[in-house]
């Protein structure tokens, strides 16, 4: 019997903001949809996205992503002006927007895009993180912990092969 593909397959990652986890400590993550133009979807399919200097801000009860660079393809339509740094509206429920607004305004949190991925093969989604910026000593501690994990794995592997 042939096994059918699971409908809950892992989403295909388009882009990841690697600096986000280094610069911020996230307390909560959520998924948001994106309002995109046709040429942006084509460019995203080709992988021409950069999330490195990207952040989310709230204005008039809506969330917008700023700094997300989507490089237009050479074959993009000529009758549309392609702006690589156009603001992208995030599609969130009113409940989620109110929660984000409260935490950002009252407690000084930042909203940062962590990754962009395909959901069900057709919808572009963004994983956003709600967190606070790390101090320099926090970054050093994280680096030390990460290096220790690598060293520990190396020693365990060496013990396993020689022991």
UniProtKB/Swiss-Prot annotation:
> Where along the sequence do coiled-coil regions lie?
none
SUPFAM superfamilies reported for this sequence = Small protein B (SmpB)
UniProt xrefs under CDD domains: SmpB
A GO term (biological process) for this protein? Answer: trans-translation
Q: Which GO terms describe its molecular function?
A: RNA binding
Q: PROSITE patterns, alphabetically? A: SSRP
Q: Which Pfam families match?
A: SmpB
Q: What keywords are annotated for this sequence in UniProt? A: Cytoplasm, RNA-binding
Which compartments does it reside in? Cytoplasm
Transmembrane regions listed in the UniProt entry: none
Question: What's a GO cellular component annotated to this UniProt protein?
Answer: cytosol
Q: InterPro entries from the entry? A: SmpB, SsrA-bd_prot, SsrA-bd_prot_CS
> What's this chain's function?
Required for rescue of stalled ribosomes mediated by trans-translation. Binds to transfer-messenger RNA (tmRNA), required for stable association of tmRNA with ribosomes. tmRNA and SmpB together mimic tRNA shape, replacing the anticodon stem-loop with SmpB. tmRNA is encoded by the ssrA gene; the 2 termini fold to resemble tRNA(Ala) and it encodes a 'tag peptide', a short internal open reading frame. During trans-translation Ala-aminoacylated tmRNA acts like a tRNA, entering the A-site of stalled ribosomes, displacing the stalled mRNA.
Query: What does the similarity note say?
Result: Belongs to the SmpB family.
Protein name, UniProt field = SsrA-binding protein
Q: Which organism is it from?
A: Shewanella baltica (strain OS155 / ATCC BAA-1091)
- Report the gene name: smpB
């Amino acid at each position: 019997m042939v096994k059918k593909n699971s409908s809950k397959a892992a989403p295909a990652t388009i882009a990841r903001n690697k600096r986000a986890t280094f610069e911020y400590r996230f307390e909560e993550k959520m998924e948001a949809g994106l309002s995109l133009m046709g040429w942006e979807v084509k460019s995203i399919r080709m992988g021409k996205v950069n999330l490195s200097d990207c952040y989310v801000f709230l204005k008039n009860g809506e969330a917008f992503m700023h700094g997300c660079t989507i490089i237009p393809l050479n074959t993009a339509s000529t009758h549309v002006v392609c702006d690589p740094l156009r603001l992208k509206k995030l599609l969130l429920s009113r409940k989620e927007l109110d929660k984000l607004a409260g935490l950002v305004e009252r407690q000084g949190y930042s909203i940062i895009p962590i990754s962009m991925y395909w959901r069900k093969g057709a919808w572009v989604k963004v994983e956003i993180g709600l967190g606070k910026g790390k101090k320099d000593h926090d970054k050093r501690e994280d680096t030390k912990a990460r290096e220790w994990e690598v060293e520990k794995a190396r020693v365990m592997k060496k013990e396993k092969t020689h022991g």
